[in-house]
């Protein structure tokens, strides 16, 4: 792997990876699902790294892998945009409502998030993490009861290129892991910015290949 996280590698189908993850298998599994929903209104398509603990998917990748990925992404100079956001997020589980307040601008958004489909890839002995391809609908809500159950503070750094945002997020607040000594949750995810504009099968394949690239970064930092 070269020093920079060079996304031009994804144009070369002969690229030999340190991780033997089968991207073609991933593509074949999720392409029909993405094609079914990518033109839906308010659709969100994301890929999240994590670990399965029974049926629960824990998206906390830990500080060391998180930092390793961030350092490598920051070395790459070909990003179209790098965005930093700080958010206060309030959740209500009964109807999946969340209120997000941008700490820098004060802008507030209210949505209801409903899961459409999860495709899980777990127990992969040749990859450092499990991962989940998730399709959801995030519907804007104009008027909402502001009684919420949970609150989180999120700091996010987003690396954007070719219709994909690689998001590195730290969260503080309510957590699923009550035994964790670190109050911070470290999350790595990728979101297709505008699913409607996926041009062709090759572009989708290249987007999905980023999962393998992230795993390669983690493999080379062991």
What are these regions (language model features)?
Residues 5-222:
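Phosphate-end processing signature that detects enzymes handling 5′-triphosphorylated RNA
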